[in-house]
Amino acid sequence: MDSKEMVVEEIMRIHRSLPLRPEIDDVETATSLIQNVEKEDRNRLEAIDKLVKTSSSEVPLELFNVFKEMKKSLVRFQSTEQTREATKILDLESVHVVFDELIQRASFCIASPNSTTALPRSVPVPAPVVSSDEIPFKSKEIISRDDTFVKKAKSSFYSDGLLAPSKPQVLDSTLHQAKNVAGNDGEKLSLIKLASLIEVSAKKATQELNLQHRLMDQLEWLPDSLGKLSSLVRLDLSENCIMVLPATIGGLISLTRLDLHSNRIGQLPESIGDLLNLVNLNLSGNQLSSLPSSFNRLIHLEELDLSSNSLSILPESIGSLVSLKKLDVETNNIEEIPHSISGCSSMEELRADYNRLKALPEAVGKLSTLEILTVRYNNIRQLPTTMSSMANLKELDVSFNELESVPESLCYAKTLVKLNIGNNFANLRSLPGLIGNLEKLEELDMSNNQIRFLPYSFKTLSNLRVLQTEQNPLEELPRDITEKGAQAVVQYMNDLVEARNTKSQRTKPKKSWVNSICFFCKSSTN
């Protein structure tokens, strides 16, 4: 390098060889993400340290310690993987900071009357970013190296081609893929890309974010920055591997729909109760064993799906959800529905199939707005006697239980259209005598029971179109009649009742003329 021009050209070539500089927002996102990961790691490591071998355990202490150390090592490895992209961004930014200062030093040398003058200061070699506590730059000092990405002043460059020591304004993002990744089909988001997307969405006041099946499998928790999405109205995080929700989720104050189904969430933060505008919440297919006490604050919630979890009880606070219309708790381990359920005065649909219910509380019968009640595959022996108050009930399914009888009060729920009492096997032996009151009944499944007779009122079920009677020891109903359909059975019962009435009238004892004469004789003697 014999000439100044050759040295300048080589300096600029080296400068141009760097990858594009991260945008300020991306650097701040990476910094925040690393801080979040470190915080989460501390919590996880503390939880591992608190693991204690029980005295009754047969596991040797040394083996137990090996187990704990392996869990810690896994946490550290996962931390490294999660912060890899963020660390790369900060390392790249660190190099750009150093190069910018070196360019300024070179410019100072060229601008100086005596180019051999000592340089104003030395610049240390940049070290890789390891911890969020040691960020080697300030975001306000970031300078772009490429004039196609900056707004230049008229004197941005010297005549020799070196960058002047002014600070151009960054206009474009160098991580545009992270910004638009939500729209790229097939690509899953890493932690840094998710964090970047959250930052951009927060600045744009995004109202809807769909990340269904879009997060990498290794991503088990969400960054605290999620709470910045205060304008978000709909959020879909379903079908991922999320295990923990950040406490900052309570900051989503505009949220009306939250879909978290098919994740691995074991516990909800208390801050979930701060989502006061929430209308629809889907938590199905997770690992929840309880609900937070703050749940009672979700007074605008209309649809709640808790199916396919590990719930053993529903809290009494469920009765505070006065706007709740649909509640799905199918496929849990629930043994009892709380009496406070009567407080859900807007309830239209209650699904509690595949649980361990032994009975339904009388309070269920007071849900006058309820239209659908399905409790299949439980251990229910009896239904509430208050069911006559269910003025809007249209569908009732109590199949595959241990039902011993159907209360007469149900026959006053005259809006009933579908009734399934099938597969109660040896326990159910009769139908209520007033079943004919159910004038709107269209479908009746009474199969696989021990019912021997149909009530005479059956003849008034004029709207019945589907009837399942298989595997019952019916004594008065020929099989060929049942094979003809529901209305054939109704007509048969009508004919049977009329025939019996006619027969009973014919067999009534009539007064003979001898009895009449004796009667008059007795009257005259008196």
From Swiss-Prot:
This protein's GO CC annotations: plasma membrane
Species per Swiss-Prot/TrEMBL record: Arabidopsis thaliana
Protein's UniProt keywords contain Mitochondrion: no
Tissue: Widely expressed but preferentially in roots.
Membrane-spanning intervals of the chain: none
Top-level taxon of origin: Eukaryota
PANTHER family referenced in this protein's UniProt entry, alphabetically: PTHR48051, RAS SUPPRESSOR PROTEIN 1
Protein role: Leucine-rich repeat protein that likely mediates protein interactions, possibly in the context of signal transduction.
LRR repeat ranges per the UniProt record: 229-252, 253-275, 276-297, 298-321, 323-344, 346-367, 368-390, 391-414, 416-437, 438-463, 465-484
UniProt protein name: Plant intracellular Ras-group-related LRR protein 5
